[in-house]
């Protein structure tokens, strides 16, 4: 995942998401992963990491989560959700994914903490949804009995 060929320019990532470069600059300020380049060379956006960041951001907005989440946590929440749907999950693939995030300066501990925090967050959120759903079903049953 550290392959520089996976990195694209601001214009290319804007075209991929069908937005303008101003939006990409705003997203970058919000934490979208961006790799700084050496002097005189352009940096870039990793297509996969950027996609996971956008998916995580969208998911957290959709569930109206207003707490602070880092860019790494946004990536991890999307990664965890996608893993639930992926029947080809392997520990080796996840280790490579996690190692690939180190290119931004994250330590293995940072990545592990973000993964664990978001796994706990998702478990808690799903439990809260299940409890709420059960409560609503009980309310409907009680209302019908009245």
Please annotate each region the language model reported.
Residues 30-63:
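Short helix-start
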Residues 1-29:
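Polyanion-binding surface elements
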Residues 26, 39-40, 113:
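Proline- and acidic/polar-enriched loop/turn elements at helix boundaries
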Residues 10, 18-20, 45-46, 114-119:
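Intrinsically disordered, low-complexity regions enriched in Ser/Pro/Gly/Gln/His and often acidic
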Residues 1-6, 58-146:
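Basic Lys/Arg-rich amphipathic helical interaction modules
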